[in-house]
């Protein structure tokens, strides 16, 4: 196997290549900003649901869930209080009367 030639200092790319890469990158980066939507593919603003509407609907459902949970906890608490009162009342009455 033949020995590899010694490496020299790295060569800089030719100026034309740098200019071409610069123009290509500027074109690619600027393309999305200037791109026009294809005809017929744009959704009119009136038919697009907004983010605020989705957030409002989510908060409405969360509030309904919280109300149901609060009602359930309230009913359970009332049931437990009635049981405790009944036990306390029954403990006061003599067994023979």
Swiss-Prot record:
InterPro entries: NICOL. Residues 1-35 form the signal peptide. The keyword Cytoplasm applies. It is found in: Secreted; Cytoplasm, Perinuclear region. Keywords: Cytoplasm, RNA-binding, Secreted, Signal. It holds the Pfam family Neuropep_like. The keyword Transmembrane helix does not apply. GO terms for molecular function: mRNA 3'-UTR binding; transferrin receptor binding. GO terms for biological process: 3'-UTR-mediated mRNA stabilization; spermatogenesis. One of its GO terms (cellular component) is extracellular space. Coiled coil: none annotated. mRNA-binding protein which interacts with a range of target mRNAs including SERPINE1, ACTA2, CCN2 and COL4A1 and may promote extracellular matrix production. Binds to the 3'-UTR of SERPINE1 mRNA and stabilizes the mRNA, possibly by competing for binding with SERBP1 and preventing SERBP1-mediated mRNA degradation. Also binds to the 3'-UTR of ACTA2. Testis-derived lumicrine factor that triggers epididymal differentiation and sperm maturation. Interacts with NELL2; triggers epididymal differentiation. Interacts with cell surface receptor TFRC; the interaction mediates uptake of NICOL1 into fibroblasts. Belongs to the NICOL family. This is NELL2-interacting cell ontogeny regulator 1. It comes from Bos taurus.
């Amino acid at each position: 196997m033949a020995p590899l030639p010694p490496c020299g200092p790295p060569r800089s790319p030719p100026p034309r290549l740098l200019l071409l890469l610069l123009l290509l990158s500027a074109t690619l980066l600027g393309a999305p900003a200037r791109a026009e939507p294809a005809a017929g593919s744009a959704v009119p603003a009136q038919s697009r649901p907004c983010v605020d509407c989705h957030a409002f609907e989510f908060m409405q459902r969360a509030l309904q869930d919280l109300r149901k949970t609060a009602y359930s906890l309230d009913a359970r608490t009332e049931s437990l209080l009635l049981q405790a009162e009944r036990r306390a009342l029954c403990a006061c009455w003599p067994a023979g009367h």
